[in-house]
A protein has these predicted regions:
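Long, contiguous all-alpha helical interaction modules
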Residues: 1-9
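Structured, hydrophobic secondary-structure cores that serve as assembly/anchoring elements
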Residues: 8, 12-24, 28, 33-190
């Protein structure tokens, strides 16, 4: 198994955004020992005379409200990394030093991500039926205001969002990632 790790890594690295490793045929293998899939274990299985990937999962086995069950799937985590890297790279290449850190420019950056980039990421990475968005992080803005020695209680949300934060840009995102079909539940009645 260990000698095949590089082939699995190559499979994952070369997987297009519109599919996962689930059920992928491993043409270079003739036979594997059947293995009961376990949470956190990437495994292969025999499907008649074909070797297939059982489920493209990583080793994650604990989940919470931030790291949901979907984060065990390699396709989902790859999509997460892809989007975060793209946004950080875009910010670094095109925004740092080129735009004043004010409300309008922060909103323009958010709008570019939400209305252009996220639309391009649907349907292969993000769920196009969900309102995927990035916006100014109001809670981080409040913390910045408090650090400056002011109170936020008497401020409107717009005043909080417009508060100048120097060169810091605090954003938050709400997105839904997509995965491929992997499990079927079928009920038929007559």
């Amino acid at each position: 198994a260990q000698e095949y790790t590089a082939a699995i890594a190559g499979l994952i690295a070369g997987m297009p955004l519109n599919r996962s490793a689930d059920n992928h045929i491993m043409n270079d293998l003739k036979e594997v020992e059947d293995y009961e899939p376990k949470i956190g274990k990437f495994s292969l299985y025999m499907d008649e005379d074909i070797v297939r990937v059982n489920c493209g999962v990583n080793s994650k086995t604990t989940f919470d409200s931030t790291w949901k069950k979907d984060t065990r799937k390699i396709k989902v985590v790859e999509g997460m990394c892809f989007i975060v890297d793209d946004i950080r790279d875009t910010f670094k290449k095109y925004w740092i030093g080129n735009y004043i850190s004010d409300y309008d420019n922060k909103m323009n950056f958010c709008s570019n991500i939400t209305k252009v980039y996220f639309k391009e990421m649907s349907p292969n990475v993000l769920n196009g039926d969900y309102d995927n968005k990035v916006e100014i992080d109001i809670e981080a803005q409040k913390r910045a205001i408090i650090i400056d020695g002011l109170e936020t209680d008497g401020m409107t949300d717009l005043e909080i969002l417009q508060y100048p934060t120097g060169d810091e840009v605090y954003l938050t995102g709400d997105v839904r990632f997509v995965d491929t079909m992997a499990s079927l539940s079928l009920t038929m009645t007559m």
